[in-house]
Amino acid sequence: VVPEDFEGYCRVRSATKIAVAGGECEYTAFGFKRYIERGCIDIAQPDICVSGGLTEFQRIAAVAGVYGTAVIPHVWGSGVAIAAALAAIAAMPLFPHTANPVPFQNEPMMEYDRNPNPLRDELLVENFELKDRKVKVPDKEGLGIDIDDKVLEKYRVL
């Protein structure tokens, strides 16, 4: 279903018992409000790197929370995107109304792409490790990451 097809999302949602996620191509809390009010999705999936950063993510999570809709960040890109998503979910309150089945009930979650990706696998000085379905939240200042300047230069576009 293309992102702008709200009715298509609703048809998919009504035809399945599986929770429907969407919104990775939506950029604002106002856009997510349309998805949620129309009953298009069970899980809002904002991409923090394209939807206005951590501040807009918090706004989206607030709107979703009013309607009892779960929020799980869409993460498809660099190690910086993973760090931003980890920071976002670490700051979120537990969500008791989630549509996700146990054992994930109330656990903060994010999408974690495992396809080969040099911007995810090479860009950071220390990579994130997915172990037992968990990723450690960095405890350094900011996003808690350091960029490898040589790798950044390697992928620089003029």
PLM regions: where:
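C-terminal hydrophobic helical "lid"/dimerization subdomain
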Residues: 139-141
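Active-site and glycan-interaction determinants of carbohydrate-active enzymes
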Residues: 137, 149
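Intrinsic disorder at enzyme termini
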Residues: 152-153
